[in-house]
């Protein structure tokens, strides 16, 4: 730098930390020159990279590393309190519409609004690009927590108004009473705050959601069943089966066909109601391959039964997702041609 005309410096390289362990850092800055253009100062910053930082460069708040350390150091003494997981709604749109610099400005002002609302006994951490966690270890009162959220919202609205509504945004929050950390652990704690914030956003954003154990367990159940469905589809539709509901000609007392129904048995939960697993197939997109498998099984079964009952017919149900997202007519014709089953 001393021998060039460059005024900026930005370089990644390795240092040794206090334990003589190598760490990657980024050093960047701007050169201040004197009257004769001689370099006088290098103003900038040095950041550790390739590892989680202790503090956030944009807001100056401590980061998740510090939050995790605090909990691990305090696990035996914390017996009450709450967490508020705050997220800026649609923050990506702020960056896209106004640029990253303005997005950073919104982050700093949001942090400032939070800091102006919390008490000396409360702490705030920056844990993700647009998310913060407020920690209170003095009260487990959920009304106190929700009132704090409302207070922060008012300060943010005031900031937006003072900024001439250049960008209008809201925040959502998930509120979690502190559980027994010796039983729960830090990783599970963060999963629960993530769930609470997600629920607040699913409820329409610009609101807070207080953690409910029953809803969380249902969320875990849905996630596990969805994972099992993925695994089943990837392993030859293991766990799926079909059953037949007879269709009778009452006047002739004769079996004429059947409605074919799909069933799924979970390794962990046992038989799952179609009212539960079919919507999961639809939302995950697995209904397309599963529907083809179901169609194939029904047609194959029909062909075998026709050896005994020549005019036997089967009825199958299809999903709206199959109709709109796949060429279901082509699939049906292809499966019938492959089985040698003529249409009724």
Residue spans of the language-model regions?
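Active-site core of bacterial EAL-family cyclic-dinucleotide phosphodiesterase domains
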Residues: 14, 221-280, 317
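Short loop/turn elements at sensory-signaling interfaces that couple input to output
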Residues: 27-43, 255, 266
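Catalytic strand-loop-helix junctions within cyclic-nucleotide turnover domains
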Residues: 34, 135-145, 161-166, 170-189, ...
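C-di-GMP signaling machinery
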Residues: 48-51, 199-241, 251, 281-285, ...
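Conserved long alpha-helical elements within nucleotide-processing catalytic cores of c-di-GMP signaling
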Residues: 53-82, 89-119, 125-129, 133-134, ...
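Catalytic-core segments of nucleotide cyclases and related cyclic-nucleotide turnover enzymes
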Residues: 149-150, 163-165, 170, 178-205, ...
């Amino acid at each position: 730098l001393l021998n060039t005309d460059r005024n900026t410096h930005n370089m990644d390289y390795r240092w040794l930390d206090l334990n003589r362990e190598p760490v990657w850092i980024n050093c960047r800055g701007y050169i201040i020159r004197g009257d004769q253009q001689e370099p006088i100062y290098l103003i900038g910053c040095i950041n550790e990279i390739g590892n989680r930082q202790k503090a956030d460069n944009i807001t100056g708040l401590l980061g998740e590393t510090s939050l995790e350390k605090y909990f691990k150091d305090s696990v035996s003494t914390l017996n009450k309190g709450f967490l508020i997981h705050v997220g800026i709604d649609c923050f990506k749109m702020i960056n896209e519409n106004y640029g990253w610099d303005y997005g950073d400005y919104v982050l700093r002002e949001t942090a400032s609004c939070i800091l102006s609302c919390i008490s000396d006994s409360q702490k705030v951490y920056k844990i993700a690009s647009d998310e913060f966690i407020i920690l209170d270890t003095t009260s487990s009162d959920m009304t106190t927590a929700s009132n704090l959220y409302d207070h922060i919202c008012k300060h943010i609205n005031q900031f937006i108004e003072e900024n001439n509504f250049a960008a209008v945004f809201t925040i959502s929050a998930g509120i979690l009473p502190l559980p027994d950390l010796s039983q729960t652990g830090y990783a599970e704690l963060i999963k629960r705050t993530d769930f609470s914030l997600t629920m607040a956003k699913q409820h329409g954003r610009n609101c807070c959601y207080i953690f409910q154990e029953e809803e969380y367990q249902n969320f875990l159940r849905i996630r596990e069943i969805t994972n099992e469905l993925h695994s089943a589809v990837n392993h030859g539709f293991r766990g799926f089966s079909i059953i037949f509901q007879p269709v009778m000609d009452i006047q002739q007392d004769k079996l004429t066909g059947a409605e074919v129904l799909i069933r799924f048995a979970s390794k962990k939960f046992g038989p799952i109601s179609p009212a539960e697993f079919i919507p999961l197939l639809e939302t995950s997109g697995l209904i397309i391959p599963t529907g083809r498998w179901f169609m194939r099984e029904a047609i194959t079964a029909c062909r075998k039964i026709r050896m005994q009952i020549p005019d036997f017919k089967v009825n199958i149900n299809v999903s709206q997702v199959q109709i709109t997202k796949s060429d279901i007519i082509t699939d049906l014709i292809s499966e019938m041609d492959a089985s040698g089953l003529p249409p009724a």
